[in-house]
Amino acid sequence: LGKLKKEDNFYTFQADVVDEHQLKKVLLKYKDELPKISGLVCSAGKAPIPKKIEDTSINEWNEIIQSHLTGTFISCKVFGSYMAVNSYGAIVNISSVVGYNSGPVLAYGAAKAGVINLTSALSTQWAKDNVRVNAVAPGWTDTPLLRPKERKNKRDLTPILNSVPQNRLMTTKEISNVICFLLSSNSSSITGTTIKCDGGTLSGAGWFPYGGFPNKEKNSSPYYLEE
């Protein structure tokens, strides 16, 4: 962002996405100074901590739901409604594969499932206003959040990699490529869709009862059963 700030057409604003008043102030202050707002990416959210339901407080639940789902709702309400009035725009909401499959991050999974449903609903509401609304559901992605540099002991990523048919982490570049595509005119007929960018994680979930994923060796598919 430091480099981009030097560009004449780049601006940064700080606001709390769960505060509708703050977002409205940003819109009202800059809508006449900036070019037409034509794109919105809702990606803000607090990192979840895996816990059992018995160990999850109401405050912890609310914090995750607010940051991932309520923040997306308010951002879409403020900026998406503005796009609808101007009959032009594209919105990309960030969901997750956990929005489809359960995991020990209860509030996070519920919030990301809600983002998928919200995306579908808004895409229908604003279709005739020429505002497209889609979502991206990333899988395990190589970010500092997953393996921070300050971690003394390197995290064993083997269980994660073994759950991905491509046997690797997604990159932020791959996720951003999908986001840019959905914001562009190249996806002009796509709305109400959630694109999974997960290396096949969700598609491969049903293979584990049969021994796991196939490998490259001939006749070595794990689902092969000897007589």
Feature names for model-found ranges:
Residues 81, 124-128, 188:
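Alpha-helical segment proximal to the catalytic Tyr-Lys
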Residues 73-76, 88, 168-197, 202:
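C-terminal substrate-recognition "lid" of short-chain dehydrogenase/reductases
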Residues 15-25, 58, 173:
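The beta1-alpha1 cofactor-binding region of Rossmann-like NAD(H)/NADP(H)-dependent oxidoreductases
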Residues 92-114, 119-128, 140-141:
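Catalytic loop of short-chain dehydrogenase/reductase
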Residues 51-53, 60-62, 160:
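Substrate-binding pocket helix/loop in short-chain dehydrogenase/reductase
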Residues 50, 180, 191-227:
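Short C-terminal tail/terminal secondary-structure segment
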Residues 35-38, 83-95, 128-131, 193:
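Active-site loop of short-chain dehydrogenase/reductase
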